[in-house]
């Protein structure tokens, strides 16, 4: 299964300023597979350590963090010689042994020749729990579920993914039905690697749903296992409210939908926990269109999206038959699925700040507004081919952005500074 992140790993390997690498991401987005596959493809040997199931290695890191001593201990455990130039050293579930995280500082300072990649499903939480963390001594890589282009490649449609990257929109339009059909499948299957692999091999939607149910059950178990006891009920209520939050026309998060009378201060910690786990994307409001957008962030107003569109459909009980009814998929629960999909694709784009906009009166709302570092692009999301976008026009008149995007099921079209970008090509937004 091809992952675009593999190219980033290869650049890391070849960098002269390489530091130990930490891969962040939710459980079951493919971190372990990616690290092992990277070692298989680009190294002579790979030594894999899972700190969640290896007490001996936990003991090794419990005392002296001298790098020569640690390497010797790993060699004795694995029975293999670690060659700095040709061996990839993988630390998995590294959050389980905080001193293993701390050791990365010493590897960077005293033994930078070693190639070390780390990951942990709950790493974000560990970083907020007082763990001694090697600030400035490590590189980071965020891994998300498969994007739509990665889904196309996994489903045997590599040339279609390549065509999107080339942005040959006249040719893309000629094959738009293939893209639309694949997009409907992606809305159901999502991008969790196990679900995508199953679909690619068997085309069985029922099997995909069972996999998604197991993933959701595993997340629920994580709530009980890893979250502080006092916030577990709040995490569950908040998590289960997300489909109904997104089903509303105004998708701003409302605490009252979690529990009647709920207030922000009661659930802030639960939101932070889910965000640190990588299970939700918190998209904050901005009230202006200047660079950098973060300067205009309103931390009190936000939308919450799930990590994956397929999991959202599973939680909402979206049925397989919806896929067979023409464009009905984009009518039933259309706003939620479409905005979730767009958010998910935008989050996979490196160094892209993602927000949403409303003016202070609430009379103008832009579904997403993104900061590329060079320009701010407002993004209006339409589930079907309806191209009316009153708010987008109002925003353009006020802030005169270089380009504005309306993404829908309609074909690519550019008129002055307004671009209609097909939903299946939204990953290309930073390349416009």
Regions found by a protein language model. Give the residues of each.
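Conserved catalytic cores of phosphodiester-cleaving nucleases, focusing on short active-site segments
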Residues: 346, 366-385, 404
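Interdomain motor-coupling "hinge/lid" segment immediately C-terminal to the ATP-binding subdomain
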Residues: 128-247
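Pre-Walker A adenine-sensing motif
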Residues: 2-16
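Structural recognition of the conserved hydrophobic beta-strand(s) that form the central parallel beta-sheet
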Residues: 90, 115-121, 142
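Short glycine-rich substrate-engagement loop in P-loop NTPases that contacts/grips substrate
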Residues: 53-85
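Hydrophobic positions on the alpha1 helix immediately C-terminal to the Walker A/P-loop
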Residues: 34, 38
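Conserved lysine of the Walker
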Residues: 31
């Amino acid at each position: 299964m091809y992952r675009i992140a593999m190219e980033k790993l290869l650049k890391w390997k070849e960098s002269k300023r390489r530091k130990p690498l930490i891969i962040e991401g939710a459980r079951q987005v493919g971190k372990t597979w990616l690290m092992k596959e990277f070692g298989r493809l680009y190294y002579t040997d790979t030594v894999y350590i899972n700190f969640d199931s290896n007490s001996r290695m936990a003991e090794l890191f419990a005392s002296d963090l001298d790098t020569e001593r640690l390497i010797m201990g790993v060699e004795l455990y694995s029975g293999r010689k670690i060659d700095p130039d040709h061996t990839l050293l993988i630390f998995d579930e590294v959050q389980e042994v905080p001193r293993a995280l701390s050791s990365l500082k010493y590897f960077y300072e005293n033994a930078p020749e070693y190639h070390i990649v780390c990951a942990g499903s709950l790493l974000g939480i560990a970083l907020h729990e007082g763990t001694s963390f090697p600030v400035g001594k490590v590189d980071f890589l965020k891994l998300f579920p498969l994007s739509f282009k990665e889904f196309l490649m996994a489903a045997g449609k590599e040339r279609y993914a390549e065509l999107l990257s080339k942005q040959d929109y006249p040719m893309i339009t000629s094959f738009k039905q293939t893209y639309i059909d694949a997009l409907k499948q992606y809305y159901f299957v999502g991008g969790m690697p196990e679900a995508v692999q199953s679909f690619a091999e068997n085309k069985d939607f029922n099997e995909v749903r069972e996999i998604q149910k197991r993933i959701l059950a595993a997340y629920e178990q994580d709530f009980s296992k890893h979250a502080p006891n006092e916030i577990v009920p709040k995490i569950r209520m908040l998590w289960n409210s997300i489909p109904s939050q997104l089903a509303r026309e105004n998708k701003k998060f409302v605490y009252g939908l979690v529990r009647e009378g709920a207030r922000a201060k009661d659930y802030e910690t639960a939101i932070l926990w889910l965000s640190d786990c990588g299970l939700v994307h918190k998209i904050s409001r901005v009230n202006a269109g200047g660079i950098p957008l973060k300067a205009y962030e309103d931390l009190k107003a936000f939308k919450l999206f799930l990590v994956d569109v397929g999991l959202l459909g599973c939680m909402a009980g979206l049925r397989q038959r919806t896929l067979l009814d023409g464009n009905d998929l984009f009518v039933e629960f259309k706003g939620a699925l479409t905005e979730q999909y767009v958010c998910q694709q935008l989050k996979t784009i490196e160094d892209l700040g993602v927000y949403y906009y409303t003016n202070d009166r609430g009379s103008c709302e832009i579904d997403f507004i993104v900061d590329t570092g060079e320009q701010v692009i407002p993004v209006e999301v339409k589930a079907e081919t309806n191209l009316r976008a009153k708010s987008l026009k109002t925003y353009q008149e006020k802030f005169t952005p270089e380009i504005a995007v309306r993404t829908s099921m309609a074909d690519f079209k550019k008129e002055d500074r307004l671009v209609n970008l097909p939903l299946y090509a939204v990953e290309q937004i930073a390349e416009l």
